[in-house]
Structures are given as structure tokens and as C-alpha cells.
Amino acid sequence: MEVNVWNMTDLWTWFEDEFANATGMPPVEKDYSPCLVVTQTLNKYVVVVIYALVFLLSLLGNSLVMLVILYSRSNRSVTDVYLLNLAMADLLFALTMPIWAVSKEKGWIFGTPLCKVVSLVKEVNFYSGILLLACISVDRYLAIVHATRTLTQKRHLVKFICLGIWALSLILSLPFFLFRQVFSPNNSSPVCYEDLGHNTAKWRMVLRILPHTFGFILPLLVMLFCYGFTLRTLFQAHMGQKHRAMRVIFAVVLIFLLCWLPYNLVLLADTLMRTHVIQETCQRRNDIDRALDATEILGFLHSCLNPIIYAFIGQNFRNGFLKMLAARGLISKEFLTRHRVTSYTSSSTNVPSNL
């Protein structure tokens, strides 16, 4: 379906109706030009089904990961503590998935308070995820490249680091909590997005560029640096066991980037276009709007993928899961002995003990 948009009022109504849940901001600049807008978007029922599956898989998988790590208290490593917090963040976000699913179908019917809270949870999940992965990369870099027991081996320091990550993630996410509002224009579904008032372009630049610089780009550079030197050390020293055990961490980082990097790149392109750093055309505007919808779904999918990684390539996770079942009498000791896979302990390899 195509709609001729000839003034700001019509455009505003169309955007709220068709892109109610897109994170991209509606164009409100004075020089906004009329466009022939293509409103064909992803099938909302398919999106609802995807969100429902993500909710179920994430709820089950991340709860299981937390149980396995909490049960293996005696041999819990520093990386396990970080991954425990990562599972907590994904589980917290998963609890909001039913709300996102309903909003795709009916618009935002939950009011402004829940609009603020759910948006805050989404951003906290994103920032805490990449900051925790950056901390893991630093820990592995110091432990393998410099072959030393880092200060983070002290359990109480790890807890303070995790608390600091949660606090920083909350600070970086506060703009979404402060500025998100629900609007219900006539003949249109209610929407939840930032109300920036005047000077929209300036505030959009601040709210997008600064948090993503400190909460995404810088942690990403830290990860690339640390894992680059870590991989070089592993290959040069022929540390076979450490290399195999590091597969889980590398897989977690790779999946995070595959899920969230496309969304952030599209969001950056949208910001540059809306602030006139790059030329804005009707075709480019429509392409970016569609890309925001698609890549946001990919980002949401991330919350259920880490447990799948642990189950398929995390030897110690499978061992910990079987051990937990045996302790509860759900499987026999003989079954545990026969099916338990060989693991690499953190004492000999200095890698995650439970995953």
C-alpha cells in the first residue's frame, strides 16, 4: 500500500500507525519534504510468533543457565559470575517480550509508566550485555596473555564490578526512561517513543551518539583488542585445551555482535540522516525505517541464544546440568558417569568452570 504524504500532519499520523514500535525517531524537522511512502512492513503476526518463541526459549534457557551456575558454587570462576549476570539481563528482558508482542499487534496500550520501564529494560539489557562481555575479554586477556591471576579473581571485587556495570548501564539508559511518552493521535494506534520537543535534531544526536559511543563502540574496541591478542597467544603457544574451552566465550561474543551490530549500524545511519550529516531522500528514509524494524527483531532474538550456545558447545555446562539432575535424583549416578563429557577445569586451563 502507498500513501501520498504532503504535509507534516499526514506524515505524523502515518508514522505512528505503521511504525509504532520502531526505535527510530519520526522526522519532525521543519524542512521535512513530502514523499511517496511505502508502508509495507514485516507481517505483524509473524513478528508476534517470533517474540513468543523468544520469550519461551529465553525464559527456560536463561533460568537453566542461572541454576547451573548457582548450583556449582564451589568451582565458580570469574567468567561464570559475568555470564550469570548476562543470563540475568537476558531473563529480565525476556519478561518484557509479551508486552512488545502485544504492542506489535495493538499498538502501545499499556500507558506511559510501562512505556518508560520496558524501554529502560531493553536498553539496560543491551548495555549490560556488551559491558559484561568486555569485562570477560579483559579477564581472559590478563589470564592468558599475561598468564596471571587478575585482581578480579577475588570474588568480592567481581561483585563490585558487576554492580558497577549495572549502574553504568542504568545511567546510559536513563534518557529513554526520561523522554519516552505514549501518544494517542486520532484514528491511529498509540505509540511509545521519545518526546524531544524543540531542537529535535540536537537532542537526537546527544541521546544516540553519546550513549552508543561509551556503551557500544568503546567496549567493542576493548573486546577486539583483548581477543585479538588472546587468540594470537593461544595459537603461538599451541594451547589446545585453552583454545577449545575458549570456544564458548568467542561464540557468545560473535552471536552478540551478529544480533546487535546491524541494529546499531542502521540506527547510526538513521541518526546521521535525520541530523543532515548525510543526504536524506525518500528512498533512503523508507529503507532505513524498514531496516530498523528488521534489525530490532534480530536484536531481540539474542536474549534466547546464549543458552543454546552453552548447550551445544559448552562441555562444562552439560556436565554441571547432569550433576545437578543427579543431585536431585532425576538421573542415576551410573547415567552421570556414562554420559558425562570430559571437561577442562578452570584450575588447569583458567577458563570458565561451568560453561
Swiss-Prot record:
Which stretches are transmembrane? 41-67, 74-92, 115-138, 160-184, 205-232, 248-270, 291-313
Biological processes, Gene Ontology terms? calcium-mediated signaling; immune response; neutrophil chemotaxis; positive regulation of cytosolic calcium ion concentration; receptor internalization
Species name: Oryctolagus cuniculus (Rabbit)
**What is the name of this protein?**
C-X-C chemokine receptor type 1
For this protein, what is any one GO molecular function term?
A: C-C chemokine binding
Reported function: Receptor to interleukin-8, which is a powerful neutrophils chemotactic factor. Binding of IL-8 to the receptor causes activation of neutrophils. This response is mediated via a G-protein that activates a phosphatidylinositol-calcium second messenger system.
What does the similarity note say?
A: Belongs to the G-protein coupled receptor 1 family.
Q: Which regions of this chain are Cytoplasmic-facing, per the record's topological domains? A: 68-73, 139-159, 233-247, 314-355
Q: What membrane topology is annotated for this entry? A: Multi-pass membrane protein
Give the UniProt tissue specificity note.
Neutrophils.
